[in-house]
Regions:
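Residue-level preference for alpha-helix termini and adjacent loops
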Residues: 34, 38, 89-90, 124
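Generic "edge-of-domain/loop-turn" microfeature
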Residues: 46-49, 70, 127
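Short, surface-exposed, charged loop/turn segments at secondary-structure junctions
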Residues: 58, 69-83, 131-147
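Short, catalytically relevant binding-site loops at active-site mouths
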Residues: 62-64, 81-84, 126-127
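Catalytic core of PPM/PP2C metal-dependent serine/threonine phosphatase domains
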Residues: 1-65, 103-112, 173-175, 179, ...
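C-terminal catalytic subdomain
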Residues: 100-191
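Conserved, helical-rich catalytic subdomain that frames metal- and/or nucleotide-binding sites
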Residues: 73-119
Length: 191
């Protein structure tokens, strides 16, 4: 069983982010919902037995442990969907933290022997690359994303140790064109 300390650390980090947004909104004379944002949070540590990964996910986008060698893609949560298309849940919504059962469902822990990449991305990346939430569970789609990143004809990203140019390569890659997808694009990759 995973220690309650991990839940405290990850859950408190998410809650502190929620509180910080509320405090900033108050200081600016704005409403917290003016700062509506998703949150994709993960911590990980390598041990002799493998990797420990814990996460907290509010909103849409994608948070996934991907392993090309074993052809697996493990979502570390479930994207939130609203009542209508294009709607989601946001970190700024107070009920995210008042319903303890729903809160703990947002926390995930995994131990894996190894992985190729830990991906965290907003829907500006996940929507055009995966098209549906069901496709987020398809390892073939994650293979396609990995191949697009690393073998892109126009803007390849060299995801190798000590590649200082990776950040600029990734920024160039994020500028891809996708009809009907004009949302913000943010991606973090641990590889």
């Amino acid at each position: 069983m995973i220690s309650s300390d991990v839940y405290q650390i990850v859950g408190n980090a998410a809650y502190k982010a929620h509180k910080a947004i509320n405090e900033e909104a108050k200081m600016q004379g704005a409403r917290p919902k003016d700062y509506a944002t998703t949150l994709l949070l993960a911590i990980c540590k390598k041990f002799e037995f493998g990797w420990f990964v814990a996460s907290f996910w509010v909103g849409d986008g994608a948070l996934c442990l991907y392993d090309k060698n074993s052809h697996t893609a493990t979502l570390l949560g479930t994207p939130d969907e609203g009542e209508y298309a294009g709607q989601t849940r946001f970190l700024t919504m107070p009920d995210i933290f008042t319903d303890s059962s729903a809160f703990y469902k947002r926390l995930k822990c995994r131990i894996v022997p190894d992985f190729t990449a830990l991906f965290m991305m907003t829907d500006g990346v996940s929507d055009p690359k995966f098209e549906t939430d069901a496709n987020l569970n398809n390892p073939d789609k994650w293979d396609d994303l990995w191949d697009d990143l690393t073998h892109n004809k126009e803007f390849p990203v060299e995801l190798i140790d000590d590649n200082e140019a990776a950040k600029d390569q990734l920024l160039n890659w994020l500028d891809f064109w996708a009809p009907g997808n004009h949302d913000d694009r943010t991606i973090a990759i641990l590889y």
